[in-house]
């Protein structure tokens, strides 16, 4: 499998322009080398193996799989942010609006927060890709050995701890659920 374009970068694997030396477990490059009919499947397999190996940086040269991965991460980020913002709106709307009208905004916002949190939990929570973010910072990208690539527009993923992020949106969504159940009970049972 090493002959299929996989390269690990370790000390001395980059150039003298690097400001930080990377160990062999820091960076993995999915090279765009077409060696048969199933090259796209091989790229996906290499990416999956790199994600499961938990490399700090993953550089994806193949444009199609890089764009798909970046979109997948963007959708997950959107679900997370929507869950947090809608849950926050659900919880703080009763403080800002009169009580007679606040439930018209807070209940739909709470349901939206719960829906996004549930969808994130089902589709993204156990995906190894959710531990990564797409890196756009030019300074951080300059520290990586991108000069060895054949692609001019690689997608660079950086591994980040998402434990606090998941706790935040789960806590806010749970609080929104409690508020919504309480409010529905007050509106219809009393």
Swiss-Prot record:
InterPro entries (alphabetical): TMEM11
Principal location: mitochondrion
Keyword Transmembrane applies: yes
Domain of life: Eukaryota
GO biological process: inner mitochondrial membrane organization; mitochondrion organization
Transmembrane parts of this sequence: 84-100, 107-124
Family (UniProt): Belongs to the TMEM11 family.
Protein name (Swiss-Prot/TrEMBL): Transmembrane protein 11, mitochondrial
Gene giving rise to this polypeptide: Tmem11
